[in-house]
Amino acid sequence: MLNPFFIQGTAGEQNLIQDLINEQLRMYGVEVHYMPRSFIHENSVIREVIESSFESAYPIEAYIQNYEGYADNPVLLSKFGIEQTQELTFVISKERWENYIEPLVRDKPDVRLSSRPKEGDLIYLPLGDRLYEIKYVEHEKPFYQLQKNYVYELRCELFRYEDEVIDTGVMEIDDNLLGNETDGYDYDGNS
């Protein structure tokens, strides 16, 4: 039996931790734009997305965990040859997500899973003027500190443009694909 005189995770302590995290993200983070993926056409048999679009961008503060450069940078041998991925990890506040972005995304009919950031959505980072695709969302880290989770950790890779329609209304993002870059690389292959 647990000691009844020591209460783990009172609402006041949880709110204090969440406020401290929000304050740190505002001080040490950067403003990024979260872009939810909208599904236009989908194959009903294998549930493959045939066509998708990004029609809105929501600013939110995020902390970049690996300022030293891209993460592990594993070199993969794919069917098209050797491929090197460029990965970044962003940390965003769960409370800011639930209060600011979730109500806006929930009202969109062609967006799925509005309760948290989801894999396949995009993050626009103005520091490098690049788009990153969310590959994995860690929503239980740190693991229930004071019996609550406070942040989402987004593991992202440099976005490779295929057939997506990107028209967010934010000129910095929309011009990103009209200039020299389509997948984060110039036409000559330099990053």
Language-model region placement:
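Glycine- and charge-enriched low-complexity intrinsically disordered segments
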Residues: 152-191
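Short alpha-helix capping/helix-loop boundary micro-motifs
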Residues: 88-113
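Active-site-proximal polar cores
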Residues: 1-74, 191
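Acidic-enriched and Gly/Ser
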Residues: 74-89
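Short beta-strand and beta-hairpin "edge-sheet" elements
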Residues: 122-145
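Short coil-to-beta transition motif at edge beta-strands of beta-rich domains
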Residues: 110-125
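Short, solvent-exposed secondary-structure boundary/capping segments
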Residues: 89, 138-156
